């Protein structure tokens, strides 16, 4: 199944230092593609960073077109960040598409990334960010920086990888978001009740703010 993704023309053997002059060139280096799983893995294995699709030849949330992948970084540098451990997680083994060691991985300090390719693309930046945040919430040990709609992921030259070939349905993403927002609403209610006496009408407004109609929210 072709996936909408953007691949950089850069081949990064290591991370680009903050403030490096090359960042502008890098942000303009992503080309919108439609690739199958092996094509994406080949790009990552060759050291090419990937991100969501953008317009105007510039990677930014304002230029977001769509995203058809979600990814989680596991950087604990222990057994829980190994490919073997992650591939045995029930959710990952069912819905994960592939796992690879990251550019910062060391055998004595393992780091890995799980990619979930979606059956349909997410068409709005705010909804992509929400989906990424919800997945992070479900995996409390994942790197919290993975939720930006313009977030890119470095390739990892010569990385180890495991192909799982799972696909994460958009309907499942919506369910995860619903649970994520519900947990936030419940926490807000507990905080309000602990500190204030709030009129029923205001409490309902707060609840609604955390429970948008799912419908076509992700499209």
Residue ranges and their predicted role:
Residues 4, 98-101, 178-219:
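Long, charged low-complexity interaction segments
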Residues 19-29, 164-172, 206:
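Short, polar loop/linker segments at the starts of domains and inter-domain junctions
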Residues 81-89, 117-142, 163-180:
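Helical (often loop-to-helix) elements that flank the catalytic cores of nucleotide-handling enzymes
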Residues 105-107, 116-117, 144-168:
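Short, conserved secondary-structure transition motifs
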Residues 4-14, 150-153, 158-159, 172:
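Electropositive, intrinsically flexible nucleic-acid-contacting patches
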Residues 1-110, 117-130:
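Signature for HUH/AEP ssDNA processing cores
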């Amino acid at each position: 199944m072709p996936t909408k993704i953007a691949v950089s023309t850069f081949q990064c053997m290591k991370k680009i230092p903050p403030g490096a002059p090359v960042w502008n060139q890098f942000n303009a280096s992503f080309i919108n593609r439609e690739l199958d799983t092996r094509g994406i893995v080949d790009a990552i294995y060759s050291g090419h960073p990937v991100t969501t699709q953008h317009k105007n030849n510039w990677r930014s949330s304002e230029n977001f077109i769509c995203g058809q992948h979600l990814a989680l970084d596991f950087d604990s540098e222990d057994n829980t960040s190994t490919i073997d451990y992650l591939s045995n997680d029930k959710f990952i083994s069912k819905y994960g598409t592939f796992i690879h060691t990251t550019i910062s991985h060391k055998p004595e300090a393992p780091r890995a990334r799980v990619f979930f390719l979606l059956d349909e693309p997410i068409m709005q930046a705010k909804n992509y960010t929400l989906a990424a945040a919800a997945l992070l919430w479900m995996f409390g040990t994942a790197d919290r920086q993975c939720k930006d709609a313009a977030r890119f992921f470095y390739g990892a030259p010569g990385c180890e990888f495991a192909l799982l070939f799972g696909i994460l349905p958009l309907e499942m993403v919506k369910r995860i978001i619903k649970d994520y927002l519900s947990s936030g609403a419940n926490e807000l209610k507990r905080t309000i009740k602990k500190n204030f006496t709030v009129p029923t009408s205001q409490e309902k407004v707060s609840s609604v703010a955390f429970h948008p109609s799912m419908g076509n929210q992700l499209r």
